[in-house]
Regions:
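Bacterial N-terminal signal peptides that target proteins for export
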Residues: 2-13
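Core hydrophobic alpha-helical transmembrane segments of single-pass membrane proteins
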Residues: 14-18
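Sec/Tat signal peptide C-region and signal peptidase I cleavage site
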Residues: 19-27
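Sequence context surrounding c-type heme c attachment/ligation sites in exported
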Residues: 29-155
């Protein structure tokens, strides 16, 4: 029979291990939620920008700036939360559309991310509707290029 002291130690050890596993799951889930929040915010911003591009909304430099600022803020928040770290896939309990290939050796995700940052920067440098319409397609292509390779189909 186990001594009371040994039983308490084992119980505490099991509790600590369980807590660690729970925290790992919670951390991974929080990372995925941060990643999803970034993508949702980017989608909203892209919707506003696409409406201008399609002529569904008038060109408005303030809307362009606010949309790009929202993307940059979402990116910074996701980076702070380590939303794109491979650890976000370890022990997650919520669904994600991110493919594991993002973190595979030889992944092009870093180059795709840089193309998105560069396209955002170029669009932010535009000063009028003509410049916006010339620069916007690169941003859409950067988003789509990453999604085609690294996002699972939704549904």
């Amino acid at each position: 029979m186990l001594s009371s002291k040994l039983l308490k130690s084992l119980t505490a050890g099991v509790f600590i291990i369980g807590l660690g596993v729970t925290l790992a799951y919670a951390a991974a889930d929080d990372q995925i939620k941060a990643r999803q929040a970034e993508m949702k915010g980017n989608g909203k911003a892209m919707g506003a920008l696409a409406a201008i591009m399609k002529g569904e909304a008038p060109y408005d430099a303030a809307v362009v700036k606010a949309s790009l600022d929202a993307m940059a803020a979402g990116d910074a928040a996701a980076n702070e939360a380590k939303a794109w770290d491979a650890s976000s896939m370890e022990g997650a309990t919520i669904e994600t559309w991110a493919k594991p290939e993002i973190w595979a050796e030889g992944s092009q995700v870093g180059a795709k991310y840089q193309a998105w940052v560069d396209a955002r920067t170029a669009l932010a440098a535009t000063t009028d509707e003509a410049g916006f319409k010339a620069a916007f397609p690169a941003l859409g292509a950067a988003c789509g290029g990453c999604h085609e390779m690294y996002r699972k189909p939704k549904g």
